[in-house]
Amino acid sequence: MGKRILPQRMGRGTPTFRSPSHRRVGPAKYPPLKLDRTIKGKIIDLLHDPGRWVPLAKIVLEDGTTFLTPAVEGMYVGQIIEIGPDAHISNGNILPIGKIPEGTQIANIEKRPGDGGKFVRSSGTYALIVGRAGTKTQVQLPSGKIIEVPNNARATIGVIAGGGRDEKPLLKAGNAYHKWKVKAKKWPKVRGVAMNAVSHPHGGGSHQHVGKPSTVARETPPGRKVGHIAARRTGRRKG
């Protein structure tokens, strides 16, 4: 009899596969909407969050409200930022996207007003405002896709900090171990064909091969449900 394969163990949710969220600094999102006026805030700290690839800026507002937001390039401790419709077009300021000129680099964009920021939050990324369409603003994401968001959704002026993070080589497996230890990722990821037959349906044999169809049905039982699950097609496209 075989043993429980890796996907079955993952589903049980033991600490090995669970995200260490207790180490996180906190949620990074904008404070509640205050579109009727512009307020100022001060960056009191720049924090490293083990669960992110980007540093966080801790900001305290005039009314004492404190919040975290992904830092943009050029931010520094002690910097005064503005939040609101009349804020200047300056690095780190937060404005409704309808008030930002076309061609401006922006980040941490709200999908809906008040959701705290959903788009362009990864290190080194930015979006561009490319046009207007009534009550919507057209934004080009880092992928090249153009989306429309409401004019009163907020965004930060600038480029998310931490660009070039993945340019430094890991060099050794120990560095990769620590990289993924703080994430909800199991590392290393071993191929099924490299395992023994007892550990995976694709394992075993005198050479590495699947040995059976790699496409399985959606209703396949857990110990066999590996490979191409309910695939419509596999392989290279032809023609």
UniProtKB/Swiss-Prot annotation:
An individual GO BP term: cytoplasmic translation
Gene Ontology, cellular component aspect: cytosolic large ribosomal subunit
Source organism superkingdom: Archaea
SUPFAM superfamilies noted in UniProt: Nucleic acid-binding proteins, Translation proteins SH3-like domain
Residue stretches of biased makeup (Basic residues): 225-239
Gene3D superfamilies hit by this protein: 2.30.30.30, Nucleic acid-binding proteins, Ribosomal protein L2, domain 3
Single GO MF descriptor: rRNA binding
Keyword terms, alphabetized: Ribonucleoprotein, Ribosomal protein, RNA-binding, rRNA-binding
SMART domains the record matches: Ribosomal_L2, Ribosomal_L2_C
Annotated region described as Disordered, given as residue ranges: 1-28, 199-239
Subunit structure: Part of the 50S ribosomal subunit. Forms a bridge to the 30S subunit in the 70S ribosome.
Family: Belongs to the universal ribosomal protein uL2 family.
Function: One of the primary rRNA binding proteins. Required for association of the 30S and 50S subunits to form the 70S ribosome, for tRNA binding and peptide bond formation. It has been suggested to have peptidyltransferase activity; this is somewhat controversial. Makes several contacts with the 16S rRNA in the 70S ribosome.
Protein name (Swiss-Prot/TrEMBL): Large ribosomal subunit protein uL2
